[in-house]
Curated annotation (Swiss-Prot):
Binding sites annotated in the UniProt record for NAD(+): A5, V6, H7, F8, G9, G10, G11, N12, I13, G14, R15, G16
SUPFAM superfamilies: 6-phosphogluconate dehydrogenase C-terminal domain-like, NAD(P)-binding Rossmann-fold domains
Sorted UniProt keywords: NAD, Oxidoreductase
Enzyme class of the recorded protein, top EC level: oxidoreductase
Species this chain originates from: Coccidioides immitis (strain RS) (Valley fever fungus)
Name this protein carries in UniProt: Mannitol-1-phosphate 5-dehydrogenase
Length: 388
């Protein structure tokens, strides 16, 4: 019997990153989603194309050997597929993990295969698989929780690949950056060994990879988006072509680099090279990306462990400079009432109805005695006063 992977999330990352590499590693991929349009399209086509874009041009691959299930209508089938799968992955967004946990828990509980299921969440969030693991445990019969590790092993991952705005007529086909990084911790698999997925770099300690990626790629990308949005730019390329915005991005990444170098002992020169590569990637004209898309979900992006507050809070605790990160946070706070982005409307409401202190606590999760708190309050109060 061939290898099988169940993947939650039929979106661009699911099809164009995770699905592509599972296919190339000879897995049959079972896509699971609640969106009728995506599932209907996947069920109606025997293949789709992934076009990798770089400065050297484009290269197209074809993905086949997949099926698709609508979990809204066929949850029992999803559970059955998980019970016989080798791997479960997801790219659904951190806020959706709690909704996919019940069928995963049921599928794991129904397993009779000796080898434990490998579960890897592919989300832009620190410890996303740990979060999913917690939800799975909450949805497992208490008498079966202790033996859960005999049926499934959960490993955190760090993913890095830019998916630009897609052509509205592209259907299932995905245009995606050629560069990628998919790093997964191997320790949880213990004596069983990790699953065979060629694209993955398996490591003992994931923390440096997760924070370096989140606090460089995501911090840089979001900084360009928020400054660009507030300065009337349409795309990230346009934003990064503006010397002022490029300088703001560089300054923010200089601060996050201080943290990465100090905390993990990564050589400063190596981190500088990494930053240069990231700045070049997000400035790529072939990956033209709309600022509203990159900036969407500002509430999540202003969160405690996220791309701004995460590094800034740790730097403040170390007594280091955070001016550029505070500037980027201020721009994120100004990302309000953006069409088709519910969080931007909620952000506007919070800033209108709450005091600066209460809004800061609610948005960032910072404690009032944290060394960063008062400095964020200043920025929140400034934004509440209106346009800069």
């Amino acid at each position: 019997m061939g290898k099988k992977a169940v993947h939650f999330g039929g979106g661009n990352i699911g099809r164009g990153f995770v699905g592509e590499f599972l296919h190339e590693s000879d897995y049959e991929v079972v896509f699971v989603d609640v969106m009728d349009s995506i599932i209907d399209a996947l069920q109606g086509a025997s293949s789709y194309k992934v076009t990798e874009v770089s400065n050297e041009g484009e290269h197209t691959k074809t993905v086949t050997n997949y099926r698709a299930i609508n979990s809204k209508h066929n949850l029992d089938q999803v559970i059955s597929e998980i019970s016989t799968a080798d791997v479960v992955t997801c790219a659904v967004g951190p806020n959706i993990l709690k909704f996919i946990a019940p069928p995963i828990a049921k599928g794991i509980d129904a397993r009779t295969i000796e080898r434990p299921l490998a579960v890897v969440a592919c989300e832009n969030a620190i410890g996303a698989t740990d979060t999913l693991h917690k939800f799975v445990k909450e949805n497992t019969d208490p008498s079966r929780v202790e033996s859960l590790s005999s049926r499934a092993r959960f490993a955190n991952s760090a993913i890095d690949r830019i998916v630009p705005t897609q052509d509205p007529d592209s259907g299932l086909d995905v245009k995606i950056e050629k560069f990628y990084e998919w790093v997964v911790e191997k320790t949880p698999f213990g004596e069983w060994g990790h699953p065979d997925i060629q694209a993955i770099l398996w490591v003992d300690n994931l923390d440096p990879y997760i924070e370096r990626k989140l606090y460089t790629v995501n911090t840089g990308h979001a900084t360009a988006a928020y400054y660009g949005y507030n300065m009337g730019k349409k795309t990230i390329y346009e934003s990064m072509s503006d010397e002022k915005i490029r300088g703001h991005v560089r300054d923010a990444l200089s601060e996050t680099s201080t943290l990465i170098v100090d905390k993990y002992g990564i050589p400063a020169q190596e981190q500088r090279k990494y930053v240069d590569a990231i700045v070049a990637r997000i400035s790529n004209p072939h990956l033209e990306d709309v600022v509203e898309r990159v900036g969407r979900a500002p509430l999540r992006k202003l969160g405690r462990k996220e791309r701004f507050v995460g590094p800034a809070s740790q730097l403040a605790e170390r007594g280091k400079k955070v001016d550029a990160l505070l500037g980027a946070m201020e721009q994120a706070l100004r990302f309000q009432n953006v069409l088709e982005d519910d969080e931007s409307f909620e952000l506007a409401k919070i800033l209108k109805t709450e005091s600066a202190e209460d809004a800061t606590a609610k948005l960032t999760g910072l404690e009032s005695d944290h060394p960063l708190f008062a400095r964020v309050v200043e920025r929140v109060a400034k934004v509440q006063k209106g346009p800069k």
